[in-house]
Design a protein with these regions (language model features):
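Intrinsic-disorder/low-complexity, polar/charged segments enriched in Ser/Thr/Lys/Arg/Asp/Glu/Gln
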Residues: 1-5, 60-62
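A composition-driven signal for long, intrinsically disordered, charge-rich low-complexity tracts
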Residues: 1, 30, 85-87
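Compact, glycine-rich, soluble single-domain proteins
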Residues: 7-57
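C-terminal structural segments of small proteins and small subunits
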Residues: 52-87
Length: 87
């Protein structure tokens, strides 16, 4: 298992478009990919789970990957989030 703290920089947080992009990228990996925000744990491979976490701009999440390709998954998803998730 690998994890990293990441700050959401999207002005409108994780709304539908960036949540969809995050999930699409997460689904490429075999590893379990989730994030923790406050008391919430969200499955990064589920748009509804990501949206349900209600993550806003400036919020810090802990991205957690576990599985065969966990390091690559963590690096890729972290880069995507740090790049603004297409916004």
């Amino acid at each position: 298992m690998v994890s990293q703290m990441v700050t959401i920089i999207n002005p409108t947080g994780l709304h539908l478009r960036p949540a969809g992009l995050l999930c699409k990228e997460a689904l490429r990996f075999q590893s379990s990919i989730k994030f923790e925000y406050g008391n919430t744990t969200a499955n990064a491979k589920s748009v509804l789970s990501v949206l349900g976490a209600c993550v806003k701009c400036g919020d810090e999440i802990e991205l957690i990957c576990e599985g065969a390709d966990e390091k690559e998954a963590l690096e890729t998803i972290t880069e995507l989030i740090n790049g603004g998730l297409g916004e």
